[in-house]
Amino acid sequence: MEEETHTDAKIRAENGTGSSPRGPGCSLRHFACEQNLLSRPDGSASFLQGDTSVLAGVYGPAEVKVSKEIFNKATLEVILRPKIGLPGVAEKSRERLIRNTCEAVVLGTLHPRTSITVVLQVVSDAGSLLACCLNAACMALVDAGVPMRALFCGVACALDSDGTLVLDPTSKQEKEARAVLTFALDSVERKLLMSSTKGLYSDTERRYSKS
Amino acid sequence: MAAGFKTVEPLEYYRRFLKENCRPDGRELGEFRTTTVNIGSISTADGSALVKLGNTTVICGVKAEFAAPSTDAPDKGYVVPNVDLPPLCSSRFRSGPPGEEAQVASQFIADVIENSQIIQKEDLCISPGKLVWVLYCDLICLDYDGNILDACTFALLAALKNVQLPEVTINEETALAEVNLKKKSYLNIRTHPVATSFAVFDDTLLIVDPTGEEEHLATGTLTIVMDEEGKLCCLHKPGGSGLTGAKLQDCMSRAVTRHKEVKKLMDEVIKSMKPK
């Protein structure tokens, strides 16, 4: 487990700067993942989506404070640090989303009265930040060897004013979009684990984006 | 006997009820608790509303103050929500800085205001580049018995409908603002977002309007905020068990009916208040 695993994936090879226009459809930016790059945490991963990059570290299963311990499950904690400034209310809300998603897949009952801490650091933000954080957290949990019943992935999509769907939007596309939807889907049953949306959209558009 | 069983095995106790398609408090799976709303109770606030969803009680007070707009949006006012969950409402909360639950709820309400465009921020402008209104919306929970997000959204909507802003003119010579307290006008509320919360049990069963105990036993929660045209302002599903597309569809239709119920209730209350 000491060697670095470097996975590179290209779907419809495109430059990840976002300045080149992407047509509607299913093209994602170039994404990459690197595991086991930090020496102190039990597991770590860096996930890159275009220019958005998030670094995740997982400590666990480790000792837990008596006030926080759950008698039959592991206590999951997520800490999200923004690139600039101190963590605020928006970060707390995102931490809650990521934590609940991880709790749904991690087999906490195998490690009762322990804590699993996921620390996420935003390295650069160029759109689809929440999706990138989810992916980084998942890869870091895998690298740490935490037992999970499924893998999950985060996907962001933006709906612009005429209803066209763009996957993995850049910050410019997110700003111009009417709505930005972020989903987390699990790998085994393809069910919706987490959903967080920004903006107004109709129900049919939601169903289209989910498919 | 039942109380003992409930303490020892709360999940099994609940499952027995859910098998019969009902809940311990006698409700059906898709039934909401009795909703009551009281508008204009706080006389020192510019707008206020008290909402009770069964036992869950949330009061919202809106205060309007002056502020200088930011340079990149000189004609936009501000709406600043803040949800407070004091130790009064439940033994889970301690006094001190806002805990995670309160921060998440505040962020949720801020997102709802932003996404649904309930108020056009340009309406809050008095003098572009110099003076705008800032509406501080403080939501305080007085009794926490589950489903705080629905109650907060409803309280916010009712309070904003109750807000009356005085007319402000900028005096040309002194460049000071003159407030005419005698002439007040209501805010222009463009949409009516209504939140409907669901709790997921055992990855399959969906119940509407969970109480505090049900939220604790649930494996996941889902909140849908809809406006009157059936447009979704927010689909908030913070993790938890997975949901299939068909289940989500059921939730959507329930949210639509709930929206109609809430709108009817609000219109009745507003109508009864108007001749003042």
Swiss-Prot record, chain B:
Cellular component terms per the entry's GO annotation: chromosome; cytoplasm; cytoplasmic exosome (RNase complex); cytosol; exosome (RNase complex); fibrillar center; intracellular membrane-bounded organelle; nuclear exosome (RNase complex)
Subcellular location: Cytoplasm; Nucleus; Nucleus, Nucleolus
Gene3D superfamilies documented for this protein: GHMP Kinase, N-terminal domain (3.30.230.70)
SUPFAM superfamilies to which the protein is assigned, alphabetical: Ribonuclease PH domain 2-like, Ribosomal protein S5 domain 2-like
GO molecular function, one term: mRNA 3'-UTR AU-rich region binding
Gene Ontology process terms (BP): exonucleolytic trimming to generate mature 3'-end of 5.8S rRNA from tricistronic rRNA transcript (SSU-rRNA, 5.8S rRNA, LSU-rRNA); nuclear mRNA surveillance; nuclear polyadenylation-dependent rRNA catabolic process; RNA catabolic process; RNA processing; rRNA catabolic process; TRAMP-dependent tRNA surveillance pathway; U1 snRNA 3'-end processing
Keywords assigned: Acetylation, Cytoplasm, Disease variant, Exosome, Neurodegeneration, Nucleus, RNA-binding, rRNA processing
Modified residues (N-acetylalanine): 2
Location (main, coarse): cytoplasm
Function: Non-catalytic component of the RNA exosome complex which has 3'->5' exoribonuclease activity and participates in a multitude of cellular RNA processing and degradation events. In the nucleus, the RNA exosome complex is involved in proper maturation of stable RNA species such as rRNA, snRNA and snoRNA, in the elimination of RNA processing by-products and non-coding 'pervasive' transcripts, such as antisense RNA species and promoter-upstream transcripts (PROMPTs), and of mRNAs with processing defects, thereby limiting or excluding their export to the cytoplasm.
Disease linkage: Pontocerebellar hypoplasia 1C: A severe autosomal recessive neurodegenerative disease characterized by cerebellar and corpus callosum hypoplasia, abnormal myelination of the central nervous system, and spinal motor neuron disease. Affected individuals manifest failure to thrive, severe muscle weakness, spasticity and psychomotor retardation. Vision and hearing are impaired.
Subunit-structure text: Component of the RNA exosome core complex (Exo-9), composed of EXOSC1, EXOSC2, EXOSC3, EXOSC4, EXOSC5, EXOSC6, EXOSC7, EXOSC8 and EXOSC9; within the complex interacts with EXOSC5 and EXOSC6. The catalytically inactive RNA exosome core complex (Exo-9) associates with the catalytic subunit EXOSC10/RRP6. Exo-9 may associate with DIS3 to form the nucleolar exosome complex, or DIS3L to form the cytoplasmic exosome complex. Exo-9 is formed by a hexameric base ring consisting of the heterodimers EXOSC4-EXOSC9, EXOSC5-EXOSC8 and EXOSC6-EXOSC7, and a cap ring consisting of EXOSC1, EXOSC2 and EXOSC3.
Record family assignment: Belongs to the RNase PH family.
Protein name, entry field: Exosome complex component RRP43
Source lineage: Eukaryota, Metazoa, Chordata, Craniata, Vertebrata
Gene from which this protein is expressed: EXOSC8
